[in-house]
């Protein structure tokens, strides 16, 4: 009996020791698992980041499929849904990674320390209990042996004690066996508890993974949709066919986008605000195939079909051939606030009706006057735009005449359908003109109806001059034709030069938005340079400019003269009374960038001062004094021969048109000469109009250079009457003589500083 119990206890003890040994030997396995789980979690975090970046790119592809014409909205929608499902999978993957570190790895590391303590404690408790039970059994067994020895000696009263001792020994063995069994149970429970704990830690991780993988099942439906949408790549779906059908009959047109002609709207210059007010009308009213250089238009080179629509365009437009904005007090607002007298000015001498092919010239009395233009009198070209029916008010000085001929929407990279070279269409006028009975009568400012009915003049006019001998006149005309040809061809030379010279601003700088004073940072270096002579201060409201294309032959004669000292700009140079003619598109002199620093503009009083653009003095035509007006050339076909094909016919009114001296710079110039002194009527034989090059030469020659030898060269140009100028002076010598520079004082910071 005892041997059987002893054997059983020994087996239980061995089992316990095996269990404890297994638990202690499992620690490296748990540690390796924790290590590998940490690496997996790290890779999952990297995968989450990569998946997020991948899905961002995937979403862009889906958006592109939605917005492009080739990809339909159905494909884009399916791809978007696919991306959304993947984003949900990515979110579940992120949660799975978090659960792996929070619910499994970290708790398992903490639990392992507890497991080690419990296993050691179980082993110690088992050893203690086993030792105690063995000691008790040994003691009882020793007592039983003593009683057995006494019973063998023949003592009969010892037998009951012996039986009791044997029972105690048996009980101790049974207790030992039970103790061993309890120890084994505890060891097994502990070992099982470890796995149960591990499963409890792994369950949330598995749940997150199942949730993540559950999202994948939604991809099957989306994949089937994409397969059906892209079944036949070579067949257009109905939605794409509808795009083609919707395009029919619409006015949608486009042109290749080229580099911008102006700075951005945040740093745009003088024409930004004015052009932003009419950018919608101007973009819709351009002729087909042409481009707009409006700086505030979002699509700068957008064209529309004029044949389908002819909307009303604002009279204040961005002048393309001068680069300045015609300022209209009623229609547009200047980028910089002007003084109260600023509405009575033209910023460049460019007519508000620059899109029309004719100019309505009011009576040339003393002072400025508003002039109403009835819409019924307009005779636009095929490509011109009808003006509004209401009257536009602008002021035109006596002696100013708008002569710009190039439409502002013209694409300067190539000539338009109506922009033939002027030299091919000029006709020489050698016939004498008949006397004009209206030439001697003074015209006052009280006759706007007469101006509305009679003053139908084309933009390109010639300046009336004294009669010259036929041979000299022919030679001058030859020179004029050569010069005008150089100007005309130079205008169409390249889009770069025309953009630089015509748009009025070349690069984005930090100069005030109203100024034109900049040395371009691009290749072409167009600068604005004043060559004004003596001037008076009672004509400050005229805003004038004078530019010459850099590559023209005219500018070469002034190049050496201006090499020494030149300002970077004369955008703020004040203009005063003097025989000046302003030609916005054609007077910039080409040169290398000046070393003189440009002075920035300051403010005086409450608002900024008006911008005074450069002017060039011009020799007053040599005609006798006239009491109040300039002579008017008669109507006739010979006047028509001086214009380009765009010019309408002259002589619309029943009476002679009051003329103003102006120069036609190959259809690009507008003239703002000041009011001349009273002049008497001149005979008809003296009303032989000189060609445009003579007016150009007169514009280049300061009055001080054209006085007779008996006059003092330093005399004020205003004091020189037209009769003081010699009539027979050679125009070629006048060109060679060049331009005299005169120092002027101004408080405008953008004005040049002459040392």
From Swiss-Prot:
Where composition is biased (Low complexity), the residues are 443-453, 608-623
Q: Does the keyword Coiled coil apply?
A: yes
Q: Which InterPro entries match?
A: AH/BAR_dom_sf, I-BAR_dom, MTSS1/MTSS2, WH2_dom
GO term, biological process aspect, one: nephron tubule epithelial cell differentiation
**Protein localization:** Cytoplasm, Cytoskeleton
Keywords annotated in UniProt = Actin-binding, Coiled coil, Cytoplasm, Cytoskeleton, Phosphoprotein, Tumor suppressor
Q: Where is the segment annotated Disordered?
A: 139-159, 255-305, 327-351, 428-470, 490-513, 563-755
Where is the PTM Phosphothreonine found along the chain? Answer: 258, 425, 603
Which intervals hold domain WH2?
A: 727-744
Q: In which tissues is it expressed?
A: Expressed in many tissues, including spleen, thymus, prostate, testis, uterus, colon, and peripheral blood.
**Task performed by this protein:** May be related to cancer progression or tumor metastasis in a variety of organ sites, most likely through an interaction with the actin cytoskeleton.
Record's comment describing the protein's domains:
The WH2 motif at the C-terminus binds to actin monomers.
- Subunit comment for this entry? Binds to actin. Binds to the cytoplasmic domain of receptor protein tyrosine phosphatase delta.
What protein does this entry describe?
A: Protein MTSS 1
**Organism listed in the record:** Homo sapiens (Human)
Q: Which gene encodes it?
A: MTSS1
